[in-house]
């Protein structure tokens, strides 16, 4: 698989890191329930660093992340990541990942569809849904081919995963591990995740000139540095030496907004700067 194909076909970890959450203004921070806030965010991508054997010399791109919904109707996410990858000597490939998901507010049901394009050619397409049961989670795939399978009942969907990360950060925990299912790749994989949460940052720590810094609603809101590593569950079970498929780093606000992204694909790292942020009104439950 080429670097460009691998970059395009990996479901960006942003699906698990940039959901926006908010909490009521009253009560102790650790006792507040996590309430999701609809938002639209744009991140500009660039090559952060390369490591030995890296096959690219430049990355330029953008992520569009549009999240909506509430705990009653469920949560929808429209996601698109377009990236130009320069492998040197004038060889530039364009990857385009498009994804739409819906997750039930009760964290039991999950629907997903995605398409990966490389140089405008469709590389693969995934479509399916999953539902938690008492003994297992049932997955029904329509694409890339019809398949019905059961996955670990302990696996959580992306939104619920981030709820637990925020709850852990509020409680002062530094390590969190959960299996996560997001329907990515061929739709039949569960990823083990390891989340490392740093100390809470103050208002003057790690200042950034980005859209978050210019958002009045974020003034005085606590945030934490977070790194989430993703491991293929089947490979992790076979080997004690686990190397993540990818890892993401970001600053996570108490209300769920993420900034200062770092997408680590092992041989190269892509950074994401939050350049546009629109926080939408929360739709009340009917």
Question: Can you describe what each PLM-predicted range is?
Answer:
Residues 113-286:
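Mature, soluble, non-transmembrane domains
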Residues 2-14:
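Bacterial N-terminal signal peptides that target proteins for export
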Residues 27-74, 78-92:
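N-terminal cleavable signal peptides for secretion/export
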Residues 41-43, 61-63, 77-79, 97-99, ...:
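Hydrophobic residues positioned within well-ordered beta-strands of beta-sheet architectures
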Residues 12-23:
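Bacterial N-terminal signal peptides
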Residues 61-68, 96-103, 128-130, 248-251:
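Hydrophobic/aromatic beta-strand elements that line small-molecule binding cavities or substrate pockets
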């Amino acid at each position: 698989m080429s670097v460009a194909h691998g970059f395009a076909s990996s479901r960006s970890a942003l699906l698990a890191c940039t959901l926006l959450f908010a909490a009521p203004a009253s009560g102790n921070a650790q006792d507040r329930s996590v309430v999701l806030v609809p938002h639209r965010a744009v991140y500009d991508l660039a090559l952060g660093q390369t490591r030995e054997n890296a096959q690219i010399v430049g990355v330029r791109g953008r992520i569009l992340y549009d999240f909506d919904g509430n705990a009653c109707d469920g949560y929808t996410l429209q996601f698109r990541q377009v990236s130009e990858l320069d492998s040197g000597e004038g060889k530039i490939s364009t990857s385009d990942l498009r994804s739409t998901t819906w997750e039930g507010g009760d964290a039991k049901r999950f629907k997903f569809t995605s398409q990966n394009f490389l140089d405008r050619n469709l590389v693969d397409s995934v479509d399916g849904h999953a539902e938690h049961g008492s003994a297992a989670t049932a997955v029904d795939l329509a694409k890339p081919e019809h398949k019905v399978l059961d996955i670990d009942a302990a696996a959580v969907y992306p939104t619920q995963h981030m709820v637990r990360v925020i709850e852990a950060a509020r409680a002062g925990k530094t390590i969190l591990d959960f299996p996560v299912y997001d329907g990515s790749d061929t739709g039949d994989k569960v990823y083990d995740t390891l989340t490392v949460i740093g100390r809470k940052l103050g208002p003057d720590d790690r200042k950034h000139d980005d859209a978050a810094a210019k958002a009045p609603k974020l003034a005085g809101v606590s945030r934490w540095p977070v790194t989430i590593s993703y491991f293929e569950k089947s490979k992790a079970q076979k080997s004690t030496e686990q190397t993540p498929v990818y890892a993401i780093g970001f600053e996570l606000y108490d209300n769920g907004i993420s900034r200062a992204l770092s997408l680590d694909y092992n041989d190269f790292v892509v950074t994401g700067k939050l350049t546009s942020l629109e926080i939408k009104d929360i739709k009340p439950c009917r």
